[in-house]
Amino acid sequence: MKNNTFFKENIVPALVLVIICLVVTAALAFTYGVASPIIAENEKQTADAARAQVLPAGDGFTLYEGELAEGVAECYLADNGEGIAVTSTYGSFGGTLTAMVGVDKEGKVTGVTVTGHADTPGLGTKAMEADYLAGNYTGLDSAAAGSIKDDANVDAITGATISSNAVYQCVKEALAQYENIEGNGGLN
């Protein structure tokens, strides 16, 4: 009798818990299997929309499989040969800043958007506002200076020089990526 009580009080609850865990794990795995392709497609559409925002003339994008410039995380070629959309990173005040930069087939910046940063809201993030980015970088075809303070063509945000420089360096990396592609046969 004592053995039967031990089984009912200790083993049965443990077995029930194991069965519940197996059922929940199977349900979670099934849900992940069903949702994973949908999530991947949504992420691709979101990324393509961001690429289209920085390179409006681009019509569809294909991942560039060649060599990437330093600081470039990924590069996509516009399917119609109108340019590239580059995601680049650089150290900023609060951590790593990530920006997406569009460069047209003439080597000019068509758009910049900051896609990730850890800078303090307020002054530092002014260097990431759409008006600042468009006014300073659209049409830029060269960013050869060592930092933003040495480039007369681009204005830094006073008090946010580190954040401004991080954006500048991301644009510089994107333009370097364009030059790499042009040096290896061009966009087509």
Give the positions of each predicted feature:
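Flexible, solvent-exposed loop/hinge segments and secondary-structure transition points
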Residues: 2-188
